[in-house]
From Swiss-Prot:
It catalyses: L-glutaminyl-[peptide chain release factor] + S-adenosyl-L-methionine = N(5)-methyl-L-glutaminyl-[peptide chain release factor] + S-adenosyl-L-homocysteine + H(+). GO terms for biological process: methylation; translational termination. This is Release factor glutamine methyltransferase. Methylates the class 1 translation termination release factors RF1/PrfA and RF2/PrfB on the glutamine residue of the universally conserved GGQ motif. It comes from the Bacteria. Substrate binds at residues 188-191. The gene is prmC. GO terms for molecular function: nucleic acid binding; protein-(glutamine-N5) methyltransferase activity; protein-glutamine N-methyltransferase activity. Keywords: Methyltransferase, S-adenosyl-L-methionine, Transferase. Its EC number is 2.1.1.297. CDD domains: AdoMet_MTases. HAMAP family: RF_methyltr_PrmC.
Length: 281
């Protein structure tokens, strides 16, 4: 009589034990993606048996991760404000610090007021889209020089059902919205000095030079926003910016020279991270 050998199923805990400790967090995120659950649920599922096909996909994606590909690019998505956004190589991956920018911006947008905002450098679209979801009367315009970022923003807008209130254009900074005025301008522009490029980790470089490098000094985009912002803001409008941890003073001075009242907010590590600049009434 012919014997039939049954494949032994592997449990979540056993699978994670096969991963080196330095990749444990990445493994949990990848596995949660494959199982369609939140990473926080993984410890509660240690006894769950995993289908063979998912085990194969898990090891394939872990192999990519160990080659230095960021986890976000391996799974093709990342969370921001508890919402999932599609991501791709060459487009900035959403970070926790950007959630501070979103939260501070929301504080200045009343729930019941019709407003029009502009985002310089949309990336995945996570800033504009989160603002639109939280403020149903808001309309956003956004630009990016990266065609992949523009398409990704449009895709994410459709995913989150706000594409009817988000207008995205391919182009440099304010050029696609020349002559328009907005209630506010929001941006997480590239702010790393160009001489830092060579010392950045290789996996960070995969997010793209134009996504990360802000020019020779690193704050060139803030100079541009300070200069052009006055032309594109309505009366009593405001500017909300994410900044590098050591750029608070210089960005504050740039905006104060243009008659803005400036407040700086810190990130979770205690570093300067968000600037809110409001026009004097």
């Amino acid at each position: 009589m012919r014997k039939v050998f049954k494949l032994n199923k592997v449990k979540v805990k056993e699978l994670l034990k096969k991963v080196e400790s330095e990749y444990r967090r990445d493994a949990e995120i990848i596995l949660s993606y494959l199982l369609k659950v939140s990473p926080s649920q993984i410890p509660l599922m240690y006894a769950r048996e995993i289908p063979e096909e998912i085990v194969k996909r898990f090891f394939k994606q872990m192999k990519e991760r160990k080659k230095g590909i960021p986890t976000a690019y391996v799974i093709g998505e990342w969370e921001c404000m508890g919402r999932v956004f599609k991501v791709k190589k060459g487009v900035l991956v959403p970070r926790p610090e950007t959630e501070i920018l979103i939260e501070r911006t929301l504080e200045l947008i009343p729930q019941d007021r019709e407003m029009v905002g502009f985002e310089l450098g949309s990336g995945t679209g996570c800033i504009s889209i989160n603002l639109l979801i939280e403020r149903p009367k808001l309309v956003m315009y956004a630009t990016d020089v990266n065609p992949d970022a523009v398409e990704l923003t449009k895709e994410n807008a459709k995913l989150h059902k706000v594409d009817d209130r988000l207008f995205v254009f391919l182009g440099n900074a304010f050029e696609p919205v020349k002559g328009m005025k907005f209630d506010f301008i929001v941006s997480n522009p590239p702010y790393i000095p160009e001489n830092f490029w060579e010392i950045l980790p290789e996996e960070v470089k995969k997010e793209g030079y134009t996504s990360l490098i802000g020019g020779k000094k690193g704050w060139e985009f803030y100079e541009l926003i300070a200069e052009e912002g006055t032309k594109h803001l309505k009366e009593n409008g405001f500017i909300a910016l994410e900044i590098g941890h050591d750029q608070g003073k210089v960005v504050k001075e740039l905006l104060e020279k243009k008659c803005f009242k400036v407040n700086i907010f810190k990130d979770y590590a205690g570093f300067d991270r968000v600037v809110i600049a409001q026009r004097w009434s």
